[in-house]
Amino acid sequence: LDFQEVQESKYRRNAALQIRQEVANVLKHAKLTPETAEAQENTAEEATKEKSDSSKTKDTKKSGQEQKSKFFDKKKGQQNDYRGGFRKDSNPDVVYGRDFEGDTIPLESITGEMGEVMIRCQVEEVEAREIRNEKTILILTVTDFTDSIVIKMFLRNEQVPEVTEHVKKGAFLKFKGVTTIDRFDSELTIGSISGIKKIADFRSMRMDTSPQKRVELHCHTKMSDMDGVTTAKDLVKRAYEWGHKAIAITDHGVVQAFPEANHCFDAWGGCVPKDSDFKVLYGMEAYLVDDLKGIVTNSKGQSMDGKFVVFDIETTGFSPLTCEIIEIGAVRVEKGVITDRFSTFVNPKVPIPYRIEQLTSINDSMVMDAPDIQTILPKFLEFCEGAVMVAHNADFDMSFIIENCKRQGLPQEYTYVDTVGMARFLLPALNRFKLDTVAKAVGVSLDHHHRAVDDAACTAEIFVRFVEMLRERDIFDVDTLNEQGNVSVNTIKKLPTYHAIILARNETGRVNLYKLVSQSHLKYYRRRPRVPKSLFLELREGLLIGSACEAGELYQALLRNAPEPEIARLVNFYDYLEIQPLGNNAFMIADEKNDRVNSNEDLIEINKKIVKLGDQFKKPVVATCDVHFMDPEDEIYRRIIMAGNGFSDADNQAPLYLRTTEEMLEEFSYLGSEKAEEVVITNTNKIADMIEKISPIHPDKFPPVIENSDQDLKDICFNKAHEMYGENLPEIVEERLNRELNSIISNGYAVMYIIAQKLVWKSNEDGYLVGSRGSVGSSLAATMSGITEVNPLPPHYLCPNCKYHDFDSPEVKKFGGMAGCDMPDKICPKCGTKLNKEGFDIPFETFLGFKGDKEPDIDLNFSGEYQANAHRYTEVIFGKGQTFKAGTIGTLAEKTAFGYVKNYYEERGQHKRYCEINRIVKGCTGIRRTTGQHPGGIIVLPVGVEIEKFTPVQHPANDENSDIITTHFDYHSIDGNLLKLDILGHDDPTMIR
């Protein structure tokens, strides 16, 4: 046989290496010097050798095991906190397995099975599932904020508590494991975990380190309808942590985030100390309607029978600053008759854009030989001499005329009429007011739309018809037309809206702000809640108004190069002006319809113009962020929400995040350091200092008042008690009733019992029983006043004839704590009548608490077909306008948000792991979608108190055709201040009837 020399086993070699490594770690942890370690190692070797030489028995194997055991006992004793078991390392940061080093990889780069990987992450979810053989599978969902993944670990049951002590939700950890496709859910996971280490929070946390800090005056929360993605609490918390003195909450058209912002100051769970000087500035971004601007600009009393020139122009674009006129068409009208015409092409001296050629059918060859505007404009003005100018959407046409007059040094002030405004006034049934739509409505033909000469002729005929309609309304001059033209509610609903920031300065301003919200939802709602300028002026006391963003009327006026008098009129309306970072408005650069903005330089020019206007008119200019999400990375949530709602540009998110003072100073560095500091720091703090620290929720209780309710309740209860128990009441009945009534009356709750009593009795009179629900059955006063049929006294027998009662017999006592109706039937020992079995043994404290001061919650089940009558009867009790349905707020639910996220990535061909979709879903839930009403909740307002003292009001889901009015706030926000009746609908009373 060919024998080979025995070779050392690789397994033994690996085991030896592992032992050496562990010994080295032990020595390192014990802080032994290399010399000491070497000496101890030599001593151990010598001792082992001596023992080996002196022992020649066959028990060599046993001796080796004893030596090994002693060595590891010694090693274990040298460690301070190394516990062994699932921890294989003495490093205190190691919570499982062995220590490991190396670079981690981002989760987004893990797209398939890659073998062993190291990752850093935050634990999102922890789930422990016990399986067979006394083992548990620990399922972790983790994220590094580039992606998410599931980690699976198999542990012995006794190991689970110690591992989950460190591996818990929110923990930042480093894992070493193997990527694999899970055979149960076919998802890529990480398993075979060989090490877990604790690490510090690796997120990049922005802090505001500026010694002087700004104040953000323009913030949207999740209550901005499917737009903002940050909670009010998170915004307030961040501003407070950054050391800002205040932050403004300004949602689109609503104030429903106010209660949440106010809870930030709560004694329990609040993120801001109650005695802090930090302020929340309460406001909204209103949809402002300029009902003060007349149909006629610069009116001077001209007669409607006077001279008018109706004209139209075609241009190379939309901005009078960067675009040129290519055609002018005009018609002269005198005393309602067309008397002359003017028509000409104009050479723009630049190529006509393709889209304009497609729209107007005017090409370069048609204008090549035409005169330029320097030649044409004086001739056109001569044609217009002595006449009032008329155009459809006149601000656009006149902006080009006035800009070219300015360039040529010609007069720039003209009286002009807008036929769009006339159409809104005279044709209220129309929803759109384009020229062809208006022409069709008044029976005028339009042959070649978007040609100046034809549009002018059509507009002239429309104008002549409108003048005839004005005569029928006794309107004979332009001043009267202006006075009557924009006052109707219907007209206001069809005027364009502009954004404006409205802030409440004090308690008066808060109430006035709530009145604006109520009116904008109840009276002026059309697609959005509208605030007419006239209404704002009426309620201006205690309010500040700012010019808002690029959707504000000042910014829009600058884009269209409105005349200086118009700009001055707009600036004077506002208390302060706003400018915003260039990124907020960069979307306009790529917008083909926006010829005014072609670069960042154009955006800078507009911001500088606003700053200049602020200096000119002594208005503070503030730099705001128009915050829609907290941090730059949070834009993904808004992107998904907008994509889910059909916005084609959802992926082009503007950087609408909350910036630090340094970031804002850098944004506006082009203004110079001094001016940048003024708009970023000085003026924002100045506005904040003008505003008092107020509470959006009135702190006091305001129960309704019904005269003599205290005495009435006493009388009703005792009359019923005597009717049931006889002239001499049992002591237990009298004592319980007195105790309850004293508690109810002393805390001001008698009126609530009387209201419920009136509703129940009215329903009974009309033939419908009413069932009580909840803990009201524990109140004997409720039983005696007819609110409930539940008797909360201990079980007892009661004779309906002679009033005999039995509370104390041994037979009755056996049913203590149980229901009296379960006692055996019994005959009255006095008169022979069958006894009633009463009592459910419910303590009164169940209803009103141990001190009797808990707010009573009386829930009543009315017949479903009678419920509306019961609601209306509350108005009979308290008077019209004193009761409101309890409002609710519908937000984006988790399942719906999951669909939004899943569809977003599928439509873009991107695969996302299920756990990453769930992480993003959390950022999308809770965003306001709609409003509704509690099925039976009625809020009752005391007589003589306005509802806006507590909350604005609106129609549920903003249904303009509904006659139901609900609270604007979710009713939970105010149910501690106003009485809420629960008048619920139920099938049982209907079926019993």
Predicted regions and their residues:
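Phosphodiester-processing cores and adjacent nucleic acid-binding clamps
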Residues: T48, S52-K61, D89-T315, S319-E324, ...
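Prokaryote-biased recognition of long, low-complexity C-terminal linker/tail segments
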Residues: S69-V94, E108
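A short amphipathic beta-strand at an alpha->beta junction
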Residues: R20-E50
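Short, conserved charged micro-motifs
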Residues: E8-N14, V511-N512, I947-K949
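Non-catalytic interaction/regulatory segments
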Residues: Q21, A44-D81
